[in-house]
Amino acid sequence: MHTGKLVFAQLMDHLPLHTFRRCVAKYPGRYPTLTFSHLDQFLCMAFAQLTYRESLRDIETCLRAHSAKLYHLGIRGGIARSTLADANENRDWRIYQDFALSLIQTARKLYAKDSFGLELTHTVYALDSTTIDLCLALFPWARFRKHKGAVKLHTLLDLQGNIPAFIHISDGKLHDVNILDQIAFEAGSFYVMDRGYIDFARLYALHLAQAFFVTRAKSNLQYRRVYSHPIDETTGLRCDQTIVLTGPRPRQDYPVQLRRVKFYDANHDKLLVFLTNNFDLPALTIAQLYRCRWQVELFFKWIKQHLRIKAFFGTSQNAVKTQLWIAIAVYVLVAILKKRLKSDASLYTILQILSLTLFEKTSLIQLVINAAPNPEKPQMSNQLNLFDEISGQ
């Protein structure tokens, strides 16, 4: 039953505060917390994400305009942009990383039985990165090129619910393939990635972990065909081969057989060649798995459009990582809310509702239920439409 709480407070009721306190205790610092706690900092930054604030002054102005409601938002400390700036600058960003990761664990359990379009018993992950440009003059620690700064957001997306299972924030110079060294591969799971992650020594390590990969083959791949499996060309398949690598270095790095699947995309008149270490799934399913990689592209597009990760409230590495991890925590929190309330509304729709109603004393459950699409007017799915963009890779 609705208790008359503000919508913002109802949303934050879904936060595991005991977990948050453990994260804070794990990274003690010297920054004073008596008048502006870590939770105050998180709530202010979450408010900024949910209401699309553009600057610290913007956050301060909006919250001071509602100063009588701050207590009911859960914010106990006084609001000043200098205080928030100092907190972002000095409080360890790993507090918010660990808290976001704990929310991710909760969300993945909630979405564990969701389907992503393919009937598989395996967990399927899509791996990719996105670059967030920064002004080198303001962010000198984030040097990317001679006159350009950037950070990279490396993400392993669990396609059941589109929940990030692994996130790493690095400077823009870190090559994507190095991220494979930091992932604990799960036996029996699939890892779908583009050609930028092809390093046969690392892929062989994934193979030895009894996990599976699906990737695009490079045009200069040197190999020898061992066997050709029968195919149905009416499905778009052109070959399903067992191969071994013949290049001196690749042959040494990946000494066992691979599977090579060629698929013709009639819509774009393009041949796509895939490599995998899985020999059990149908060849067409391998091609369909790679198409699912576009879910991680959608994830990056979504958070860049709907969360504040391109305009930063601080310039230090600590402040930037704090803002990014709180943005991720907000994304996952909304995903948790959606599942717990059993809502058919999209995350985008829920975010739009929250941005307009945070200071209202309306039932959050009712708001989300009313936002669900009318079953008599089915919504078009962007998910399948995005599969067509495979021709761009």
PLM feature spans:
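Single, function-defining residue in the core of a domain
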Residues: M1-D58, C62, R91, D98-F99, ...
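A short, well-structured juxtamembrane/interface segment
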Residues: A107-F116, V177
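Short Lys/Arg-enriched helix C-cap and helix-to-coil transition segments
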Residues: I95-A107
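Active-site cofactor/substrate anionic-group-binding motifs, chiefly glycine-
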Residues: A68-L70
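Major-groove recognition helix of helix-turn-helix-like DNA-binding domains
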Residues: H72-R91, L101
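Catalytic micro-motifs at enzyme active sites that drive phosphoryl/nucleotidyl and oxygen chemistry
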Residues: H72-L73, A112-D114, W141-F144, L180
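Short alpha-helical linear motifs
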Residues: S82-D86, A107-Y111, A372-K377
